[in-house]
Swiss-Prot record:
UniProt keyword list: Antiport, Chloroplast, Hydrogen ion transport, Ion transport, Membrane, Plastid, Plastid inner membrane, Potassium, Potassium transport, Transmembrane, Transmembrane helix, Transport
GO CC terms of this entry: chloroplast inner membrane
UniProt organism field: Ranunculus macranthus
One GO biological process term: potassium ion transport
Bilayer-crossing regions: 7-27, 107-127, 154-174, 189-209
Primary location recorded for the protein, binned into one broad class: plastid
Example GO molecular function: antiporter activity
Family that this chain belongs to: Belongs to the CemA family.
Function: Contributes to K(+)/H(+) antiport activity by supporting proton efflux to control proton extrusion and homeostasis in chloroplasts in a light-dependent manner to modulate photosynthesis. Prevents excessive induction of non-photochemical quenching (NPQ) under continuous-light conditions. Indirectly promotes efficient inorganic carbon uptake into chloroplasts.
Membrane topology: Multi-pass membrane protein
UniProt keyword Ion transport, yes or no: yes
InterPro entries in UniProt: CemA
Name used for this protein in its record: Potassium/proton antiporter CemA
């Protein structure tokens, strides 16, 4: 009976993940043609924001300088100007196509994120009872573990999320989210988030250890500090 009670919430959690992903994927595929038509036919703006426009201008200037240098080296001065104009025209078209596809991808991702959030909200509201059962099952499972295993899991989790090697993972994750919402890649902003966000998590986690675990299981705190040292 207990296994059945635990199985139902797990099945419900699996259905949440699978259905939200499948519905979001289907929505993205069905909306792709509409977004492409809307962006290419009815949208007059080339860039989504000023940051992207500045980034495109910098790439265009860099491209123009490289093509100019390449033509100056390969050809004589009397014919390189015409080839330079043709090369700049071709590369400009490719640059515009690249940004155009990127904007469509950003809009689709933004709409998909909204749909995913709405689906998860509906599942949370309708299946609150199942989630409560799952939460109690997880709490019971963790409670039955020994203090040594608990300390090991806590140490492993903290090293993965806020440990010495975690900034590399945070940089990839924040950069992916940053790009997913249509922002141009900015090393300064991403580095700032990577350097501050894990520190905030580390502070919160240490506070929870001091406030909660020290009250519930003092031996676990002692084992954790012994392993950590």
């Amino acid at each position: 009976m207990q296994k059945k009670k635990a199985f139902n919430p797990l099945l419900y959690l699996t259905s949440i993940v699978f259905l939200s992903w499948s519905i979001s994927f289907s929505f993205k595929k069905s909306m792709e043609s509409l977004v492409i038509h809307w962006w290419n036919a009815e949208q007059s703006e080339v860039f989504l924001n000023d940051i992207q426009e500045k980034s495109a201008l910098e790439k265009f200037i860099e491209l123009e300088e490289l093509l100019f240098l390449d033509e100056m080296i390969k050809e004589s001065p009397d014919i390189h100007i015409q080839k330079l104009r043709i090369g700049i025209h071709k590369e400009t078209i490719q640059l515009v196509k690249m940004y155009n596809e990127g904007h469509i991808h950003t809009i689709l991702n933004f709409l998909t994120n909204i749909i995913s959030f709405a689906i998860l909200s509906v599942f949370y509201i309708l299946g609150n009872e199942q989630l409560v059962i799952l939460n109690s099952w997880v709490r019971e499972f963790i409670y039955n573990l020994s203090d040594t295993i608990k300390a090991f899991c806590i140490l492993l989790l903290t090293d993965l999320c806020i440990g010495f090697h975690s900034p590399h993972g945070w940089e990839l994750m924040i950069g992916s989210v940053y790009k997913d919402f249509g922002f141009s890649h900015n090393n300064q902003i991403i580095s700032g988030l990577v350097s501050t966000f894990p520190v905030i998590l580390d502070t919160i986690f240490k506070y929870l250890i001091f406030r909660y675990l020290n009250r519930v299981s003092p031996s676990l705190v002692v084992i954790y500090h012994s392993i950590n040292d």
